[in-house]
């Protein structure tokens, strides 16, 4: 049990080391495989790339950059020692926030793009261009990197355990929370969470309303079902991954600044923080599902790959069957010749 900085409330968060180690290991394996496959399809399989694909490529790159830092985090949470230096600690922290809020903003870009394509298909043609999509992506990268810079500035390694080990990713001091971090959290939550959340819900609602209008009722039922699945998957992943962490981050900020002085509330919030963070990190594994339901080309590429694999397997089976048939006939012929020679 340790006491919160400047607080009389004891808490024990040692469980987070095991939780982080297990969760980050799983995210590393699944996230690395799924996002590498996604990048391969985007670069090698897609012959025509549109503005939506541009957002998805940047989202996959954001996921991969964060996934590459996970082995260092896994090592730290397993050994509780950071031997990789202060710079890599700062880079790992920056890529965590860059990935989380970059994912939120890129998913929002995909949602807004879908909204423009369905609700204003003709008026939005001048807006929905690959050039504009690239400009938006550059703006997103600058925004998330600028927003994560203060956290990187305050995060650094420090000695622990009688100077026998180095710590990284540990809690900031209470004084830092009161003076700087609480204001940074307000900015991050408004720009990086609440505005994107409102945009996602609003755009999805207007798309659903447009699809139910008499003018669009003539659309094929299959197309409508596909759009509904797309919206459902998008919102579920967005809300599941990011809502718990960001709501808890607000409460966590209030606890660390001692706005909440209730020990029970503080303990609950501190306990939920590592859990919600693990849920948020899992977005690296779920983002490829968004790619699948958003892009017909990706669906077709995966189906073609699986079809070609099945076809090659069937060809192999046919060849193997033919070889077995030939071998059987040769053996039969050999036996007949041997019987005839024996009779002579």
UniProtKB/Swiss-Prot annotation:
Spell out where the chain is glycosylated. Answer: 162
Localisation: Membrane
Report the transmembrane regions from the record.
26-46, 57-77, 91-111, 135-155, 184-204, 231-251, 273-293
Q: Which ranges make up the Extracellular topological domains here?
A: 1-25, 78-90, 156-183, 252-272
GO cellular component assignments: plasma membrane
Superkingdom of the source species: Eukaryota
> Ranges in the Cytoplasmic compartment?
47-56, 112-134, 205-230, 294-344
GO BP terms: namely: blastocyst hatching; G protein-coupled receptor signaling pathway
Q: Name one GO molecular function term.
A: lysophosphatidic acid receptor activity
Disulfide bonds listed in the record: 89-168
Q: Which family does it belong to?
A: Belongs to the G-protein coupled receptor 1 family.
The keyword Ribonucleoprotein appears for this protein: no
Q: Record the organism.
A: Rattus norvegicus
Q: What is this protein called?
A: Lysophosphatidic acid receptor 6
> Which keywords label this protein?
Disulfide bond, G-protein coupled receptor, Glycoprotein, Membrane, Receptor, Transducer, Transmembrane, Transmembrane helix
Pfam families documented for this protein: 7tm_1 (PF00001)
Instruction: Provide the membrane topology annotation.
Output: Multi-pass membrane protein
